[in-house]
Amino acid sequence: MGTLCSVCKRRPNPVDTEGKVINVTDDFEEMSETEIMLACPQDKKLCKKPKESMYKTKHKSNKHGI
């Protein structure tokens, strides 16, 4: 599970294919919902973030229940 969340916190980047983790913790709050979905298109449902992060990044998702 932890690795899925790591993927969600990375921007889509060719460097990721080499296994390098790009730390964008500061930028993550500013990422749009679209960018987050691009960062992890398959794992977005499996990647459960703390509710604090969900409110900051994906306001609409809270209506679906976590």
From Swiss-Prot:
Keyword set includes Ubl conjugation: no
> Which residues carry the N-myristoyl glycine lipidation?
G2
Any Pfam family from its record, for instance, is Herpesvir_UL11
Coarsely, its chief localization is virion
Gene Ontology CC terms: host cell Golgi membrane; host cell plasma membrane; membrane; viral tegument; virion membrane
PTM entry text:
Phosphorylated. Phosphorylation does not seem to be required for recycling to the host Golgi apparatus. Packaging is selective for underphosphorylated forms.
Stated membrane topology is: Lipid-anchor
InterPro entries assigned: Herpesvirus_CEP3
Localization, per the record, is: Virion tegument; Virion membrane; Host cell membrane; Host Golgi apparatus membrane
Name any Gene Ontology BP term.
Answer: viral budding from Golgi membrane
Q: Tell me if Transmembrane helix is a UniProt keyword of this record.
A: no
User: Keywords, A to Z?
Assistant: Host cell membrane, Host Golgi apparatus, Host membrane, Lipoprotein, Membrane, Myristate, Palmitate, Phosphoprotein, Virion, Virion tegument
Similarity section: Belongs to the herpesviridae cytoplasmic envelopment protein 3 family.
- Say what the protein does: Plays an important role in the cytoplasmic envelopment of tegument proteins and capsids during the assembly and egress processes. Also participates in viral entry at the fusion step probably by regulating the core fusion machinery.
Subunit structure as annotated in this protein's UniProt entry: Interacts with cytoplasmic envelopment protein 2; this interaction is essential for the proper localization of each protein to the assembly complex and thus for the production of infectious virus.
Protein name as it appears in the record = Cytoplasmic envelopment protein 3
What is the organism field in this record?
Saimiriine herpesvirus 2 (strain 11) (SaHV-2)
Gene encoding this chain? 38
